[in-house]
Amino acid sequence: MRLQPIFTLLAIFLPLSIFAQDFSGYWEGTNKFGKAYSIMTLDIQQTGMHLEGTGEQKSLDGKEYSKFTFNGVVDKDQVKIQCLAYSEKVGNWWCLPKLEFVYSKTETEERLDGKWKPNNVKNGCILISGKAALSRPIQKASPLPVASVVTPELKMDQQGEYLVNALKERKYYALIIGVSDYEDENIVDLDQPVHDAVNLRNVLSRYYTFEEENIIFLQNPDRSSIIEAFDRLSEEVTSTDQLLIFYAGHGIWDTKLEQGFWLPSNAKQSSKAQWISNGTIRDYIRAIDSKHTLLIADACFSGGILKERAAFMESRAMVELYKMPSRKAMTSGTLITVPDQSVFIEYLTKNLRENEYPVVTAGQIFNKFKIAVINNSANGQVPQYGVIHQADDEGGDFVFLRR
């Protein structure tokens, strides 16, 4: 009896059965050198356990970038990639790294978390390394075709068409803040905020009508940079525009003052001088003359800025909410600590990506993912949505317009 062919087949197929994940497709995220972040994308083609493809690194403002080719392998639960050569490069601070990732998966996305390190090729990185994190959304399964069933085309009523046409004439502004690294050694650095901020910016600019020139992106800003951004918005935003503000980083609740604070990168644990209070944030939101302002805060104790309020909807009601000014906040929790690895932002971006309607309110998006956050957070995290106190809210709601 000859067993050699059987053993040969086992040798070929056993590695695939141990780790059968298909990495083919588009991955997007960040890499970090010191305290500086850049955006990284990989377009992977997989054959067996071998990988190849093209990638890009670019600065957060998009002005400097490099494009490159790579190959790699899947080794058990690790993905190992070697960047080979540039196809295009603008700027002088790029180098070609080796990348090592560990794969993980959640309900909403697949992740590659790891590091980049020195690479012994022409233009390769030398004696430097840093963190890297990529992700891609888990695609919804396409429904099976059903014989003799005709799906009616989705049609908007006149109210919906009016709203879409009105929103097309408006500008959508965004201030997106991610603080991962702190100067004070007594304040623990965070892994995710800048990565999450980049992820949200990409979703807003790709799927909704937020143009790049109207997005202010702040990576590890100090207090003055945040205040200057608020000042700029107060000058540029008009009474017909929409404004979204996102903050991810440390938050602190002062029980004596009964006040919450954001911690910019230059905050000190021993002094509140560089902290930004909820009161200051509220005052700026009130001063910015937008039609609708939506504040999204993914930080500990972020719920202290608002009063919870129920949301509802249909086309006619949505038009009425659009007509009325609003100052709303969506937060990752109440007066509790929240984890660095954010389930909140994961489900927020998932629902923004998967929304197929031309217009959707912030309240509708929130109601779709609130229960998922509660059910999938380790500490019973309860996200909040409601009115920002004393900020001139008149009962409206922020309306997203899909491209």
Which residue ranges define each predicted feature?
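Bacterial Sec-dependent N-terminal signal peptides
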Residues: M1-F23
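Intrinsically disordered/low-complexity terminal segments and short unstructured peptides
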Residues: F7, K105-E107, V150
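Short, charged low-complexity linear motifs
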Residues: L10-F13, P97-L99, V194
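Central antiparallel beta-sheet cores of small beta-barrel/beta-sandwich binding domains
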Residues: Q21-P137
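Cysteine endopeptidase catalytic domains of the caspase/legumain-like
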Residues: A133-R403
